[in-house]
């Protein structure tokens, strides 16, 4: 069952996945996975894990914590082989227990398998119940185990056919890296909701949630895994097959607003440039008088720079970030979360005192963090604070791998822009429109899931019905 958790004023990414098949014996695949996961740490901070295959079996290690907290040289030294996969997790389905950390490992008729998953299934409970009625026993509460169990049950037909069978049954988002004793497989859901890319370093191949992880291990970007594609890497090289896909892909638009690292390129779109363009479009037609544009570090800085470039208002630093403080959303009580905001961010008093500020952030979820930041800037002597958001108001929950508040907790679901402005204490508030946000990622040929903004989900979260399917 999906666990309902108290979270802070951010939409948080669920997971990051990484895999490498080394043809070069000089490559230490456990170390490569470590550095790849470190580059993807922004996608999950609750747990980390690595599984390694040596042609005979699979060894793995996973635990709660950040990548450098989970792994040391001794642990990595014990993970020997020529293929590895890794995972960083932020739970959206299932609890935080170490048993839910990934990769998950299972033994089936063709040997051991390990699986790492970024995404979320909307029919996981129904599938789990059906399999339990058939006698299946589940060890975890995560939907990843449902996927792995479906593959294992059909594995006697061949691993690729088992994957195809799984893809016919599950509904939701998934970017998967699957490890067998002699192969690495990358799988992307038919809508391509979650990102997955392919890279190459020498004669070895790499799979990762974002291209920044390829850079971290010295791999060259080859291409993105396509929606509905199954990429198989083994001793014969790389080959792929596809399942039937919808008429439109639906990549998560919020990847470009907040989740992805700015140095990544996803489905041909430069994340940093898309954020700068969002800031520029946010400034068009905005006639507010101000002395300085500042951004909330780190995800809103590119948009703030874009706003400054378009408006002609000078860009400056107004907030300092303590990078050694845990994220505010992990605090269980509202009072502790608000204390966490003050500990994590602090106003640069000399920079903001007496100034009329344009404060740019990427999104507002509950509004509590925005209110604290506005209050902080006013306490530091800011004369005016005009908040500008480089995305539309978040009106609906995400069902496809992002941890969001419920509809009732989303401030944009029940309050107008004017009411939100009063709640956060800003002098004015403006959101980027959805058409303008879509223009920041235009030209790639991609289409996007915009459900959190307008309710247009590619899959019905209640029934699992898929849209845009040819009869």
Feature map (PLM): residue ranges:
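PRPP-dependent phosphoribosyltransferase catalytic core
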Residues: 167, 182-183, 200, 218-224, ...
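Secondary-structure transition/capping motifs at alpha-helix termini
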Residues: 136, 156-157, 287-290, 309-316, ...
